[in-house]
A protein has these predicted regions:
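N-terminal first-folded block
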Residues: 2-43
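Domain-level signature for proteins that mediate thiol-based redox and metal-cofactor handling
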Residues: 7, 14-17, 65, 80-81, ...
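Short secondary-structure boundary segments
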Residues: 7-9, 69-70, 90-91
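Short, well-ordered secondary-structure micro-motifs
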Residues: 14-18, 49, 78, 99
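Compact, charge-rich alpha-helical regulatory domains located at protein termini
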Residues: 36-67, 91-93, 108
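A short, charged
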Residues: 62-78
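C-terminal structural segments of small proteins and small subunits
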Residues: 73-111
């Protein structure tokens, strides 16, 4: 399973970013191997409506699960249509911590 976590920095030791569409980075973690790949947000400086376009990026990368803090309305609708599951993380911890809590079933499912 591939997990995408919105992040303030590159890598699993970076802090989780609460804002979905405005996250500077997206860290994709393979839940089996633990390997990760970080993608910089190409739409970070765009004006409005980036949420659905970010969803397209995440789906293209093959994410089954998204962990983030907050979602806008358009991103929520697009994520629902994509079939990805979305979980809330608001503990100001690292990407690695968010993934661990997801695996333990300790995150609240949003979608």
């Amino acid at each position: 399973m591939k997990i995408c976590v919105t992040s303030k920095g590159a890598g699993t030791d970076s802090l989780v970013e609460e804002r979905f569409g405005r996250a500077p980075y997206f860290v994709f973690v393979d839940s089996g191997s633990g390997e990760s790949v970080t993608i910089e947000n190409p739409l970070l400086n765009e004006s409005g409506g980036v949420g659905p376009r970010i969803v397209q990026l995440i789906v293209k990368e093959g994410a089954d699960v998204v962990i983030t803090g907050q979602l806008g309305g358009n991103a929520t609708t697009t994520l629902q249509a994509s079939g990805a599951k979305v979980f809330a993380y608001g503990d100001n911890g690292t990407v690695a911590d968010a993934v661990a809590k997801f695996k333990e079933g300790k995150l609240r499912q949003l979608i």
